[in-house]
Each structure stands twice: as structure tokens, then as C-alpha cells.
Amino acid sequence: MSRDFSRTVRVADQIQRELALLIQNEIMDPRVGMVTLTGVEVTRDYAYAKVFYTTLGGDENIQLVEEGLKHAAGFLRSQLAGKIRLRVVPQLQFVYDESVERGMKLSRLIDEAVGKA
């Protein structure tokens, strides 16, 4: 069982590396600007992959980037099929990662609390 888990993690890491390169070098959509992939979760059967990303800008920029990534998902999946060797290349679902933003807010709150003490 642990062997299957480690393979899933390795596949997710490989997908993250390859997608980062593809987004940087192949996607020409102006909506997809500075995107950082923060993680990938792959289902056990490798049918689906949640790709977590962050981007610079406000809420309207997040919406534009998400639309651009969803539009490019089919292209990215086909390019990914040529880069990695899997029987089934997972369908990509892009999800904005709010953890970085939440971490910055918590850090700011801690700094304010320490400053008052």
C-alpha cells in the first residue's frame, strides 16, 4: 500500500514539474501570466489531477488566469501525454491555492500582535 502511495506522489511531482515548464514555455494566452504551481493531487487511478496555483494580482486577475488555464487544459493534457509515460493521462482541474494568501494574513496578524506587546 505504501508503494502505491509513493508512486502517486511521484507521478504528482512529475506532473507538476512538466506542467510548470509547459505553462511557462508553451502557453501564449495573455490571461495566463505569472503563474506558480504550488502542488498537484492525483487520484489513485490517475484519472484526475487537481493542480493548485497562485498568481500575482487581485481577484479579477485570478478569474482571468483561471479562465485561461481552463481553456488551455486540453492542450496541456495532450502535451503532458508526450512527456510522461502513463496509461491514462489525468484530466486537469486548476484550483487557486489560497493557502499562501492566508499564510501572509496570519503572518501580518502575528506581527501586529507582537508589535503591540
Swiss-Prot record:
Transmembrane segments: none annotated. One of its GO terms (molecular function) is ribosomal small subunit binding. Belongs to the RbfA family. InterPro entries: KH_dom-like_a/b, RbfA, RbfA_dom_sf, Ribosome-bd_factorA_CS. One of several proteins that assist in the late maturation steps of the functional core of the 30S ribosomal subunit. Associates with free 30S ribosomal subunits (but not with 30S subunits that are part of 70S ribosomes or polysomes). Required for efficient processing of 16S rRNA. May interact with the 5'-terminal helix region of 16S rRNA. The lineage of its organism: Bacteria, Pseudomonadati, Pseudomonadota, Betaproteobacteria, Nitrosomonadales. This is Ribosome-binding factor A. It holds the Pfam family RBFA. It is found in: Cytoplasm. SUPFAM superfamilies: Ribosome-binding factor A, RbfA. HAMAP family: RbfA (MF_00003). Monomer. Binds 30S ribosomal subunits, but not 50S ribosomal subunits or 70S ribosomes. PANTHER family: RIBOSOME-BINDING FACTOR A, CHLOROPLASTIC-RELATED. GO terms for biological process: maturation of SSU-rRNA. Keywords: Cytoplasm, Ribosome biogenesis. The gene is rbfA. GO terms for cellular component: cytosol.
